[in-house]
């Protein structure tokens, strides 16, 4: 179907809208038919793909890291062990320390990386920036007194901020790096968790087993821990350079994250597979530095203006910090109000970016109006108008009509993470850049000299995989995402709880996995600004743990805490009552946000109910936080079962 790319301007008719919806469905069907042709490999579970998981940033001789690791491992029993040393893990640690009931010495952070930062440790590709305003994304700016250098900070600056937080709260010496947790097992007799895994040696080899004991483990390993690598036919026949964007090889490309002048590509034919939020930042850099660049695209990104600029210290002090103590949280709440499409919006849009001008993203993350039966019908015309502007922008910036047509996104704006960049689309005007549209046939196979797509062999010196991260559809629990086996009372595993009718209390703890806490989206709040959601989880867990410790009798040495059955079922009912707020995702083009096009209507009723129990809080992040703060203010720890042992 061919229709105007500018369809749905201000005076769009119902007929035009139906045309656009038909075009959306046509593109969706094309995507559904091409999906599933290539299996995704979890690289940590497949020895043939281990090269894509190795750490390129770990120094060959990190003596200080090794000494610190061995010292902490020798202290086998720790009060709190946090799995993950990104912003999630750091926020849990900081909020626990701020209660006054825990010290840094009570806490250990364990991570497979060789430093702090989580996804910002691993990702160091050229052009990397956050796509949410740094003044609200980078946590604890008030506490650290730090001013980001730009409205959208670079990846390097964000990683350095993680290190800054660790230093301020005396956590730098409380991390066990290059250590992979593989299992958590509850020991009923000792009322502790046994944590087992392996220490990584040089080049991630020489793996040695370890075991730790924790009173209270916290799982904060994040959703983007493992690079996603499609198992293309004959992928290992390829003799050129092959790497994933999350393991960028500057030794091959030249340059660095601080200086993306990649002189090593000046005489190279380079391919990048994927055009999501990562690729749109990399493509302009590759276009400037490669002899030839081939961009393999299945689904076009919807790319709006980013408009990054340096932070003006005077303005930052007067307009942003000038709002007084608590300015960062108020700014975050202001952002959330617009992105969740609150019924009554603030009079002042403090951020004023592409996110806050996209109320339709609330279809994905939830909001107060999402629960209204006709909300999708209300928001669809607004989203169609925005997507029309996005499509028009493509044709304004891209000189070739044919290339612009291929770069034009035909799907609702909430179906893919929206992108923001000021150079990506213009890159396709360069004579050395070629777009390869693979939405029909995909990549059929690799060859020794390149790959075959659409029946054409492309000879390539390097192939870069910008294929995202493993987000398991069937292993959606925190343990599944982290590839950790968690076994609680009576042999109950976390995976079983998520698969067979999840119930939690507030999305941070679940019965039969006592003393264990976690971060995630199931039965918790969701928002664009991930660090805000993580912080709310951390604040809540810190409250629960500190209040429980306060109530522990002086003659008791052990505390066991878990939700009551009634408490977690009551919370789950609150989730189910709001699950319909996410119904708009079902008709999207396939991707990780909708289980790669999974048809829920084909499932049995009990399977559909189990899926609904996995949903986030559908009324928006503000409502979720209000529910948690109201619960805390009552001071009863309602729905929590505490048992004390001498």
From Swiss-Prot:
Q: How does it sit in the membrane?
A: Single-pass membrane protein
Q: Name one GO biological process term.
A: paraherquonin biosynthetic process
Does the keyword section mention Flavoprotein? yes
Q: Where in the cell is it found?
A: Membrane
Catalytic activity reported? preaustinoid A + AH2 + O2 = preaustinoid A1 + A + H2O
Q: How is the cofactor bound?
A: Binds 1 FAD per subunit.
User: Which cofactors, by name?
Assistant: FAD
Listed InterPro entries = FAD-binding_Monooxygenases (IPR050775), FAD/NAD-bd_sf (IPR036188), Flavin_mOase-like (IPR020946)
Provide the residues annotated with a glycan attachment (glycosylation).
46, 429, 483, 529
Task: List keywords of the entry alphabetically.
Answer: FAD, Flavoprotein, Glycoprotein, Membrane, Monooxygenase, NADP, Oxidoreductase, Transmembrane, Transmembrane helix
Question: Any idea which positions bind NADP(+)?
Answer: 129-131, 275-281, 298-299
Q: According to its UniProt record, where is this protein mainly located?
A: membrane
A Pfam family found in this protein is FMO-like
The Enzyme Commission number assigned here is 1.14.13.-
Name the site position(s) for Transition state stabilizer.
417
Annotated pathway, please? Secondary metabolite biosynthesis; terpenoid biosynthesis
What does the function comment of this entry state?
Answer: FAD-binding monooxygenase; part of the gene cluster that mediates the biosynthesis of paraherquonin, a meroterpenoid with a unique, highly congested hexacyclic molecular architecture. The first step of the pathway is the synthesis of 3,5-dimethylorsellinic acid (DMOA) by the polyketide synthase prhL.
Cited PANTHER family: FAD-BINDING MONOOXYGENASE AUSB-RELATED, L-ORNITHINE N(5)-MONOOXYGENASE-RELATED
Q: Which family does it belong to?
A: Belongs to the FAD-binding monooxygenase family.
Name this polypeptide is given: FAD-binding monooxygenase prhK
Q: Which organism is it from?
A: Penicillium brasilianum
């Amino acid at each position: 179907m061919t229709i105007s790319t500018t369809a749905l301007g201000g005076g769009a008719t119902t007929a035009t809208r139906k045309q656009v919806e038909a075009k959306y469905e046509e593109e969706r069907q094309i995507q559904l038919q091409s999906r599933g042709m290539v299996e995704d490999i979890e690289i940590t579970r497949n020895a043939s793909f281990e090269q894509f998981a190795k750490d390129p940033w770990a120094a060959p001789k990190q003596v200080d890291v090794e000494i610190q690791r061995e010292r902490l491992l020798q202290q086998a029993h720790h009060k709190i062990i946090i799995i993950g040393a990104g912003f999630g893990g750091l926020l849990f640690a900081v909020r626990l320390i701020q209660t006054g009931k825990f010290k840094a010495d009570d806490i250990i952070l364990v991570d497979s990386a060789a430093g702090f930062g989580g996804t910002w440790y691993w990702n160091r590709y050229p052009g990397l920036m956050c796509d949410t305003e740094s003044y609200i994304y980078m946590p604890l700016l008030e506490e650290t007194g730090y001013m980001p250098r730009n409205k959208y900070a670079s990846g390097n600056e964000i990683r350095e901020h993680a290190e800054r937080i660790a230093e301020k709260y005396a956590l730098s010496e409380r991390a066990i790096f290059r250590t992979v947790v593989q299992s958590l097992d509850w020991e009923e007799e000792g009322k502790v968790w046994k944590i087992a895994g392996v220490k990584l040696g040089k080049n991630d080899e020489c793996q040695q087993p370890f075991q730790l004991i924790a009173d209270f483990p916290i799982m904060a390993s994040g959703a983007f821990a493992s690079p996603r690598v499609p198992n293309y036919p004959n992928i290992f026949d390829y003799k050129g350079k092959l790497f994933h964007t999350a393991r960028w090889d500057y030794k091959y490309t030249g340059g660095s994250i601080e200086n993306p002048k990649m002189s090593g590509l000046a005489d190279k034919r380079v391919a990048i597979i994927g055009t999501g939020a990562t690729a749109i930042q990399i493509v302009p850099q590759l276009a400037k530095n490669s002899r030839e660049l081939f961009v393999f695209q299945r689904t076009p990104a919807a790319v709006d203006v980013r408009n990054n600029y340096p932070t003006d210290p005077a303005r930052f002090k007067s307009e942003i910090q000038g709002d007084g103590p608590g300015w960062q949280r108020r700014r975050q709440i202001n952002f959330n109000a617009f992105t969740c499409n609150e019924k009554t919006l603030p009079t002042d849009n403090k951020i004023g970016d592409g996110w806050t001008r996209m109320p339709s993203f609330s279809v994905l993350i939830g909001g107060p109006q999402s629960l209204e039966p006709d909300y999708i019908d209300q928001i669809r015309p607004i989203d169609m108008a925005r997507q029309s502007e996005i499509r028009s922008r493509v044709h304004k910036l891209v000189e070739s009509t044919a290339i612009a047509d291929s770069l034009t996104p035909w799907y609702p704006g909430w179906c893919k993470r929206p992108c923001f960049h000021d150079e990506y689309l213009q890159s396709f005007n360069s004579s050395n850049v070629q777009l390869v549209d693979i939405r029909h046939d995909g990549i059929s196979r690799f060859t020794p000299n390149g790959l075959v797509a659409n029946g054409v062999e492309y000879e390539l010196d390097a192939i870069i995989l910008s294929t995202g991260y493993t987000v398991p559809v069937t292993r959606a629990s925190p343990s599944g995402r982290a590839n950790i086996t968690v076994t609680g009372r009576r042999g109950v595993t976390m995976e079983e709880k998520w698969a067979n009718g999840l119930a939690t209390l507030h999305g941070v703890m679940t019965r039969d996995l006592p003393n264990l806490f976690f971060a995630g989206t199931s039965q918790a709040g969701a928002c664009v600004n991930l660090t805000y959601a993580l912080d709310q989880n951390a604040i809540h867990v810190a409250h629960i743990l500190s209040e429980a410790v306060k109530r522990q009798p002086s003659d008791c040495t052990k505390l066991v805490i878990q939700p009551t059955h009634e408490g977690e079922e009551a919370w789950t009912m609150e989730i189910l009552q709001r699950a319909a707020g996410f119904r708009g995702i079902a008709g999207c083009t396939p991707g990780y946000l909708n289980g790669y096009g999974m048809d829920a209507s084909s499932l049995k009723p009990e399977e559909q109910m189990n899926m609904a129990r996995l949903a986030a809080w559908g009324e928006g992040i503000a409502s979720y936080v209000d529910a948690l703060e109201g619960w805390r203010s009552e001071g009863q720890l309602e729905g929590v079962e505490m048992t004390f042992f001498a």
